[in-house]
Design a protein with these regions (language model features):
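Mixed-charge, glycine-rich, non-catalytic linkers/tails in nucleic-acid processing enzymes
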Residues: 89, 96-99, 105, 111, ...
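A broad, low-specificity signal marking well-ordered, structured residues that form hydrophobic/aromatic
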Residues: 20, 40, 125-133, 183
Length: 221
């Protein structure tokens, strides 16, 4: 999608049929709540599209948010609810479907292209690296991921745990330096108990004796 006309045509189409929605965040290291959408991929029954948002190949400075009534399939319900360019009341998590069928989380990294790996290594200390990786490479990655995830799609799986973990995550943790820190719950564990970590910190196992917990305080005082 590289013109306003093609964007408007796509937006009308999405109001009429179910589709897969996969998004690429600009920064590979930031939490979704501290991030932005670089581009997103749409797969309908017959067509594929990629829409640049903050990517340097974007055709507009103002890509609109869409709120639709049609079903949409996403790769991660929690991150989708944190930040997404398209919202719907009927959203299904493809990774959760894959896990329920195979008892294993889907490996999203296995289809990253050479361009992704090269830029991640070269610009490991830079922000928003995904904005400079060619859109065609993001599209190549998304195409393979969407095809594999669709194999295990089922509407019937209960997603309540994902909704609950999203509600916890979005509130964050207040710190002594007047900032918010966000964690990420992972329900895809061998024990079935969600882990809680992000950015190298295990929030579920903060040491009680070395002061690790003192930086987190109540925001309700």
């Amino acid at each position: 999608v590289n013109t306003q006309d093609s964007w408007e045509t796509l937006s009308k189409r999405l109001q009429k049929e179910p589709f897969v929605y996969l998004q690429m965040f600009s920064d590979v290291n930031k939490h979704p709540l501290d991030n932005r959408v670089s581009c997103y991929y749409i797969r309908t029954m017959t067509r594929e599209f990629i829409v640049p948002v903050h990517h340097n190949e974007k055709f507009s400075e103002d890509i609109q948010y869409l709120n639709i009534d049609t079903p949409m399939l996403v790769s991660d319900l929690k991150s989708h609810k944190h930040i997404s360019m398209i919202t719907s009341n009927e959203v299904y998590d493809l990774n959760w479907c894959h896990y329920m069928k195979t008892n294993q989380p889907y490996d999203f990294d296995k289809h990253l292209t050479t361009a992704h790996h090269h830029n991640y290594r070269l610009h490991y200390d830079k922000e928003n690296v995904n904005d400079i990786i060619p859109l065609v490479k993001h599209a190549e990655y998304f195409e393979k991921v969407s095809k594999e995830l669709m194999v295990n799609f089922e509407k019937e799986y209960d997603q309540t745990i994902l909704e609950v973990l999203y509600e916890i995550e979005k509130n964050g943790l207040y710190t002594t330096d007047d900032k918010m820190v966000y964690s990420e719950y992972n329900p895809y564990t061998l024990t079935g108990r969600p882990s809680n970590r992000f950015g190298g910190m295990n929030f579920a196992a903060l040491n009680k004796k070395d002061g690790s917990r003192k930086q987190f305080i109540s925001r309700h005082k």
